[in-house]
């Protein structure tokens, strides 16, 4: 991944001067370049500088020059061999001092000598290796004489002991070799000694202080240990260098004791002592320049440096393969593990590796960890940290005497309606495999992504020792309607009164008399087809809210909604008609809602009025008035003559006082939707009744599956209001759709909450609409499919208000039979538009408009596409038309009419005619062209179809009366026997109606 070239020059890309460490003292900073390789062949060269520790002179003054003995001990040992003439120093134009040039010259000479020695060793045969080592040991023992001088003080490295001039290097002298450990004798092999030039120390000039380079680290003088501790893998890009330690000061502690190389073996972490790279740069090893192998030939140097003895018995055990592969760079003050299988073509660790272009050992190809470790084929793959931890945990459990099962932590697991196995395992903090195993033991084969229901999930969580909290999507509805109010916050509110009864009994006329209005004259057909809400202010200032409900049978849902939101029900019964079916239905709705009933006997001004009959008929439905000892109030009124209205209002107020109606106006509003419609100019308009709280402009309202911000509040007279208090009916504008009548509405805190509620309700509505309708039984469904097909009449219904559309749909559903039914493609409130016409064309359905009209564009499109649009103002007419169409779709009934019987006396075979039956008519008449069947022993054998041949004697006749004989021939049936009975009959088709 990186190349390094430490040549002492700044080589920033682009010719710019790189960032450098300041101040830059001579010899204190070494710079180099690192070439980084990335994927897709991209590379980048960066400049790296290494700052070495600077030495400081003692406070006493100049340091004394080292003696000759000191120089002999601390001079770097060079391999024995013929001395080579030193090169002439380079000119001063290279920017180097004399000491640096001398150090560079020595490093180059040493590298050349080591290269020559390596090539010589490669050429020697394996048989001469032991002899060469024995000769080397013998020569080392001869030169191991201890020096006569006392132990020397720390001496400068080779770079500090450079000569002042090339002429001072003329006197070569052999270096003292360290004392090696004894080895078995072997065949001696002569080896020429290689003398090395030694230069006298440089003399300091007048007024100058001679500075020494840092001495080798003496921490390695501690006794070695055989305890093996695996090292942490070091970074191969570690830029730490050797010998970065200040020289030892000459103080009162005396001279440094001599090295103890003779009485101990080399340690694993011994540092190299060979020549350093130029400028003291970082020593790096790579796959092309690896560390020397243990036990192999070494370069010149001390016991731990190049050329020193091999590691003896005191060395620690071999480092594991994984750790050797991970350790890429030397650590300060420590040696480097060496692989025994590495060849001896290793350079001196102290020599800087050249990265010049065209080098013979230049790295090629992709750089990998295996290539850096030197064993690209056999290196083991590094284990992950989690794998190592698990292995250590298993080892620890084995030492403890077996694995101990970890205690499970009980948690509260939240389980929705449906959940996957993987999600359940995550919530229980358990592996998914454990959950799958448990389910397999229960006989359930599931995968990690399979979905299970909440009951199964609860069983699994309980089995694993957790507590379960079940949640559902319906929980979003919680808190929609606020909590109950405290009694201290309640204030009196107006009563809500619903007027109910049979059609044409005078409900709307009674309300007109109370409100002094004329609503009846504006209604189509004189009947109420919408539910109306009005608030009447009485003479004493009190207010009463009235709900006018339709009396037609189709508006049963409207009457039920009116009874559910009301406080008091006024049951209007005509004195001349008495109790009718819708009157009974209104009584049932009032009882179901638990609302008290006030009976208003209307039309008492008519001549045939009989209030007593009405009271007696109500007894059959458990309505006992006060005159008969009951609790139900009864008032005789006349809406047209305005008779008894004051008594009716007095009874309403009395009943409201008994009920003690109260509400809290200082809270968010909620209530019920009474009616909804789609207005062309105002959009969706909903009529609501506030039950609690105060509804204000700007509130965010959720009603059913619709929501919106209230843009306007309108009363029944079209006046705008700023707020609506409890028991006030108002129209609200601003909803995004028309809610269903009867849906509760409430004010929510923000739009996010409103969207959450409406999206859930819309999703539930879609699921219900898409769910198939369950049949009574599988047998019935199969019978319908096999015997006959249900005929459907597709229709599209558009009404002025949502309640009317709902009533029409309910009425058409009641017309359905096993053979025909009306299929509602679309129903809603609003005018007929182009989208409705296109939908009707695609479905082949007519459009039924109730109190609405189609726009001009929709009419033109319907004429072009051939779509039928029918308009209705009265619900009776619409239902009757649809009933007639459905009746025409019914298959006619075939009615059988008996004509007569004829007994077969004898059967004859006639040529070209076949078998002919001679018969006598025993009953009725036998006619030609009628249908006949063969009856044998009172069992119908065959339906023969139409009788085509009937003869009396030899003449063709149309009919034969009873008591006469005739002959009959049948095509396709020749098995006529004497004694058979031929039954003659006719089939008639009769139309049916619903």
Curated annotation (Swiss-Prot):
<feature type="binding site">
    <location>
        <begin position="602"/>
        <end position="605"/>
    </location>
    <ligand>
        <name>GTP</name>
    </ligand>
</feature>
<dbReference type="GO" id="GO:0003924">
    <property type="term" value="F:GTPase activity"/>
</dbReference>
<keyword id="KW-0396">Initiation factor</keyword>
<dbReference type="Pfam" id="PF00009">
    <property type="entry name" value="GTP_EFTU"/>
</dbReference>
<feature type="compositionally biased region" description="Low complexity">
    <location>
        <begin position="189"/>
        <end position="204"/>
    </location>
</feature>
<feature type="region of interest" description="G3">
    <location>
        <begin position="548"/>
        <end position="551"/>
    </location>
</feature>
<feature type="compositionally biased region" description="Basic and acidic residues">
    <location>
        <begin position="336"/>
        <end position="350"/>
    </location>
</feature>
<dbReference type="Pfam" id="PF22042">
    <property type="entry name" value="EF-G_D2"/>
</dbReference>
<keyword id="KW-0547">Nucleotide-binding</keyword>
<dbReference type="GO" id="GO:0005525">
    <property type="term" value="F:GTP binding"/>
</dbReference>
<dbReference type="InterPro" id="IPR006847">
    <property type="entry name" value="IF2_N"/>
</dbReference>
<dbReference type="InterPro" id="IPR015760">
    <property type="entry name" value="TIF_IF2"/>
</dbReference>
<dbReference type="InterPro" id="IPR004161">
    <property type="entry name" value="EFTu-like_2"/>
</dbReference>
<comment type="similarity">
    <text>Belongs to the TRAFAC class translation factor GTPase superfamily. Classic translation factor GTPase family. IF-2 subfamily.</text>
</comment>
<feature type="compositionally biased region" description="Polar residues">
    <location>
        <begin position="1"/>
        <end position="10"/>
    </location>
</feature>
<feature type="compositionally biased region" description="Low complexity">
    <location>
        <begin position="76"/>
        <end position="91"/>
    </location>
</feature>
<dbReference type="Pfam" id="PF03144">
    <property type="entry name" value="GTP_EFTU_D2"/>
</dbReference>
<feature type="binding site">
    <location>
        <begin position="501"/>
        <end position="508"/>
    </location>
    <ligand>
        <name>GTP</name>
    </ligand>
</feature>
<dbReference type="InterPro" id="IPR053905">
    <property type="entry name" value="EF-G-like_DII"/>
</dbReference>
<dbReference type="InterPro" id="IPR009000">
    <property type="entry name" value="Transl_B-barrel_sf"/>
</dbReference>
<dbReference type="InterPro" id="IPR013575">
    <property type="entry name" value="IF2_assoc_dom_bac"/>
</dbReference>
<feature type="compositionally biased region" description="Pro residues">
    <location>
        <begin position="173"/>
        <end position="188"/>
    </location>
</feature>
<keyword id="KW-0342">GTP-binding</keyword>
<feature type="binding site">
    <location>
        <begin position="548"/>
        <end position="552"/>
    </location>
    <ligand>
        <name>GTP</name>
    </ligand>
</feature>
<feature type="region of interest" description="G5">
    <location>
        <begin position="638"/>
        <end position="640"/>
    </location>
</feature>
<dbReference type="InterPro" id="IPR000178">
    <property type="entry name" value="TF_IF2_bacterial-like"/>
</dbReference>
<dbReference type="GO" id="GO:0005829">
    <property type="term" value="C:cytosol"/>
</dbReference>
<dbReference type="Pfam" id="PF08364">
    <property type="entry name" value="IF2_assoc"/>
</dbReference>
<feature type="region of interest" description="G2">
    <location>
        <begin position="526"/>
        <end position="530"/>
    </location>
</feature>
<feature type="compositionally biased region" description="Polar residues">
    <location>
        <begin position="28"/>
        <end position="40"/>
    </location>
</feature>
<comment type="function">
    <text>One of the essential components for the initiation of protein synthesis. Protects formylmethionyl-tRNA from spontaneous hydrolysis and promotes its binding to the 30S ribosomal subunits. Also involved in the hydrolysis of GTP during the formation of the 70S ribosomal complex.</text>
</comment>
<dbReference type="InterPro" id="IPR027417">
    <property type="entry name" value="P-loop_NTPase"/>
</dbReference>
<dbReference type="InterPro" id="IPR044145">
    <property type="entry name" value="IF2_II"/>
</dbReference>
<protein>
    <recommendedName>
        <fullName>Translation initiation factor IF-2</fullName>
    </recommendedName>
</protein>
<dbReference type="Pfam" id="PF11987">
    <property type="entry name" value="IF-2"/>
</dbReference>
<dbReference type="Pfam" id="PF04760">
    <property type="entry name" value="IF2_N"/>
</dbReference>
<feature type="compositionally biased region" description="Basic and acidic residues">
    <location>
        <begin position="390"/>
        <end position="402"/>
    </location>
</feature>
<feature type="compositionally biased region" description="Basic and acidic residues">
    <location>
        <begin position="98"/>
        <end position="131"/>
    </location>
</feature>
<dbReference type="InterPro" id="IPR000795">
    <property type="entry name" value="T_Tr_GTP-bd_dom"/>
</dbReference>
<dbReference type="GO" id="GO:0003743">
    <property type="term" value="F:translation initiation factor activity"/>
</dbReference>
<feature type="compositionally biased region" description="Low complexity">
    <location>
        <begin position="132"/>
        <end position="146"/>
    </location>
</feature>
<feature type="compositionally biased region" description="Basic and acidic residues">
    <location>
        <begin position="247"/>
        <end position="273"/>
    </location>
</feature>
């Amino acid at each position: 991944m990186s190349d390094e070239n430490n040549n002492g020059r700044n080589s920033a890309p682009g010719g710019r001067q790189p960032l450098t460490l300041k101040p830059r003292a001579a010899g204190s900073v070494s710079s180099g370049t690192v070439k980084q390789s990335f994927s897709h062949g991209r590379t980048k060269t960066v400049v790296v500088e290494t700052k070495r520790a600077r030495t400081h002179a003692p406070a006493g003054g100049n340091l004394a020059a080292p003696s000759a003995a000191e120089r002999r001990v601390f001079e770097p040992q060079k391999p024995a061999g013929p001395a080579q003439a030193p090169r002439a120093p380079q000119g001063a134009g290279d920017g180097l001092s004399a000491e640096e040039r001398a150090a560079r010259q020595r490093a180059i000479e040493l590298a050349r000598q080591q290269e020559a020695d390596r090539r010589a060793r490669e050429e020697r045969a394996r048989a001469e290796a032991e002899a060469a080592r024995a000769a080397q040991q013998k020569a080392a023992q001869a030169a191991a004489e201890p020096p006569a001088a006392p132990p020397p003080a720390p001496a400068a490295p080779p770079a500090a002991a450079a000569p002042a001039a090339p002429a001072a290097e003329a006197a070569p002298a052999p270096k003292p070799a360290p004392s090696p450990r004894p080895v078995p004798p072997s065949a001696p092999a002569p080896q020429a000694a290689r003398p090395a030039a030694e230069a006298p120390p440089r003399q300091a000039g007048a007024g100058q202080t001679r500075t020494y380079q840092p001495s080798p680290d003496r921490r390695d003088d501690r006794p070695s240990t055989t305890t093996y501790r695996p090292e942490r893998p070091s970074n191969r890009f570690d830029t730490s260098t050797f010998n970065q330690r200040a020289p030892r000061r000459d103080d009162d502690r005396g001279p440094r004791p001599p090295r103890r190389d003779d009485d101990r073996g080399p340690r694993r972490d011994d540092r190299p002592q060979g020549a350093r790279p130029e400028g003291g740069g970082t020593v790096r090893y790579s796959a092309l320049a690896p560390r020397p192998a243990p036990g192999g030939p070494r370069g010149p140097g001390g016991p731990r440096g190049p050329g020193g003895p091999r590691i003896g018995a005191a060395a620690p055990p071999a480092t594991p393969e994984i750790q050797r592969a991970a350790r890429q760079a030397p650590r300060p003050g420590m040696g480097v593990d060496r692989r025994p299988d590495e060849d001896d073509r290793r350079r001196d660790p102290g020599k800087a590796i050249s990265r010049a272009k065209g080098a013979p050992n230049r790295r090629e190809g992709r750089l990998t960890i295996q290539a850096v470790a030197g064993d690209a084929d056999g290196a083991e793959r590094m284990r992950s940290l989690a794998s190592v931890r698990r292995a250590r945990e298993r080892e620890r459990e084995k030492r403890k005497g077996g694995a101990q099962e970890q205690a499970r932590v009980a948690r509260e697991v939240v389980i929705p309606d449906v959940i996957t196995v993987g999600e359940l395992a995550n919530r229980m903090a358990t592996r998914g495999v454990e959950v799958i195993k448990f389910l397999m033991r229960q006989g359930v084969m599931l995968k990690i992504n399979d979905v299970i229901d909440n009951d199964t999930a609860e069983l699994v969580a309980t089995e694993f020792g957790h507590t379960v909290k079940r949640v559902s999507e319906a929980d979003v509805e919680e808190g929609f309607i606020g909590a109950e109010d405290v009694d201290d916050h309640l204030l009196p509110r107006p009563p809500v009164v619903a007027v109910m009864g049979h059609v044409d009994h005078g409900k709307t006329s009674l309300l007109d008399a109370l409100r002094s209005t004329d609503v009846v004259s504006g209604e189509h057909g004189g009947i109420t087809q919408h539910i109306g809400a009005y608030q009447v202010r009485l003479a004493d200032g009190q207010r009463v809210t009235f709900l006018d409900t339709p009396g037609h049978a189709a508006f049963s849902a409207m009457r039920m909604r009116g009874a559910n939101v009301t406080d008091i029900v006024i049951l209007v019964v005509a004195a001349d008609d008495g109790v009718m079916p819708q009157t009974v239905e209104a009584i049932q709705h009032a009882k179901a809602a638990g609302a008290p009933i006030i009976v208003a006997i209307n039309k008492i001004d008519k001549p045939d009025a009989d209030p007593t009959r009405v009271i007696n008929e109500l007894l059959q439905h458990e309505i006992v008035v006060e005159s008969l000892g009951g609790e139900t109030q009864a008032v005789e009124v006349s809406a047209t003559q305005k008779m008894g209205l004051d008594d009716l209002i007095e009874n309403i107020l009395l009943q409201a006082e008994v009920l003690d109606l109260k509400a809290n106006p200082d809270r968010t509003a909620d209530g019920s939707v009474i009616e909804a419609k789609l207005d062309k100019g105002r959009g969706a308009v909903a009529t609501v009744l506030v039950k609690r709280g105060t509804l204000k402009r700007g509130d965010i309202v959720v009603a059913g599956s619709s929501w919106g911000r209230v843009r306007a509040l309108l009363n029944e007279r079209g006046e705008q209001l700023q707020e609506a208090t409890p028991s006030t009916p108002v129209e609200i504008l601003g909803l995004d759709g028309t809610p269903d009548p009867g849906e509760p509405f409430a004010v929510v805190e923000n739009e996010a909450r409103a969207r959450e509620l409406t999206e859930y309700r819309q999703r539930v509505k879609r699921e219900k609409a898409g769910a198939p309708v369950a049949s009574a039984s599988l047998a019935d469904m199969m019978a319908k499919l096999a015997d006959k097909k249900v005929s459907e009449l597709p229709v599209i219904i558009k009404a002025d208000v949502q309640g009317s559309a709902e009533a029409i749909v309910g009425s058409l559903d009641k017309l359905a039979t096993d053979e025909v039914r009306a299929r509602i493609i679309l129903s809603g409130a609003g005018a007929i538009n182009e989208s409705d016409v296109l939908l009707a064309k695609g479905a082949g359905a007519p459009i039924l408009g109730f109190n609405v009209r189609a726009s001009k564009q929709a009419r033109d499109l319907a004429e072009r596409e051939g779509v039928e649009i029918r308009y209705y103002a009265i619900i009776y007419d619409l239902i009757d038309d649809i009933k007639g169409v459905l009746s025409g779709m019914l298959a006619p009934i075939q009615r059988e009419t008996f004509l007569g019987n004829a007994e077969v006396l004898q059967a004859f075979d006639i040529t070209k005619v076949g078998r002919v039956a001679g018969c006598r008519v025993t009953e009725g008449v036998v006619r030609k062209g009628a249908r006949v069947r063969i009856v044998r022993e009172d069992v119908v054998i065959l339906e023969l179809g139409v009788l085509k041949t009937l003869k009396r004697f030899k003449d063709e006749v149309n009919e034969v009366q009873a008591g006469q004989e005739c002959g009959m021939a049948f095509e396709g049936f020749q098995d006529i026997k004497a004694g058979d009975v031929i039954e003659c009959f006719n089939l008639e088709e009769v139309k049916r109606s619903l």
